[in-house]
């Protein structure tokens, strides 16, 4: 005879096996949970219609005019040396005029607040030191009341592009054009942008 506790254990194991076998015969309902689609927070920024060269914008007592654009395949520096672009590139020169129309002195916008656009591609300025042309990066950083300055910005762009492919941008409150942004999560993406066509 088996002791009682061994009999109980044997019955328990048998019951467990019987339950497991009968459970495999039952069909299991599959539950599919579909997560709701996440809201698309990203919007495509619509850029303003570009102005023609020589038109002026006013932003917080600054008058900014893009006077003209010019493409060159080389230039003479103010040190009387000749500079040529890297392979497959050319120099784009943007002539701008700024005036402090406010009642107090103001900081000159940093060069990073200017860009040239070709579609979604953005180019930033670099030093030029072109002979007989005032370099924007060499200007003093403070403009007194009523002061006006005119200077040139240099951009290195692909040689295949023409003036009609390009737009000049003034970004007074940001350093790059943000084409895709979430206005609620990224309010900086909605900073003002002023555009000019580079072609006359």
Residue spans for each PLM region:
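Conserved functional micro-motifs across diverse proteins
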Residues: 21-200
């Amino acid at each position: 005879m088996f002791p009682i506790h061994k009999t109980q254990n044997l019955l328990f194991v048998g019951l467990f096996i019987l339950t497991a076998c009968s459970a495999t015969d039952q069909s299991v309902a599959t539950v599919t949970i579909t997560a709701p689609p996440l809201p698309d927070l990203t919007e495509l920024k619509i850029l303003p219609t570009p102005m023609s060269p020589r038109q002026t914008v006013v932003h917080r007592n600054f008058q900014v005019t893009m006077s003209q654009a010019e493409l060159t395949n080389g230039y003479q520096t103010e040190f009387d040396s000749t500079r040529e672009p890297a392979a497959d590139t050319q120099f784009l020169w943007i002539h701008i005029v700024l005036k402090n129309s406010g009642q107090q002195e103001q900081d000159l916008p940093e060069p990073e607040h200017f860009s040239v656009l070709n579609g979604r591609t953005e180019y930033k300025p670099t030093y030029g030191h072109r002979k007989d042309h005032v370099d924007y990066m060499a200007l003093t950083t403070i403009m007194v009341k009523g002061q006006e300055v005119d200077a040139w910005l240099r951009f290195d762009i692909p040689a295949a592009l023409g003036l009609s492919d390009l737009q000049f941008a003034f970004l007074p409150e940001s350093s790059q054009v943000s084409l895709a942004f979430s206005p609620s999560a990224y309010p900086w993406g909605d900073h003002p942008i002023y555009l000019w066509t580079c072609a006359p």
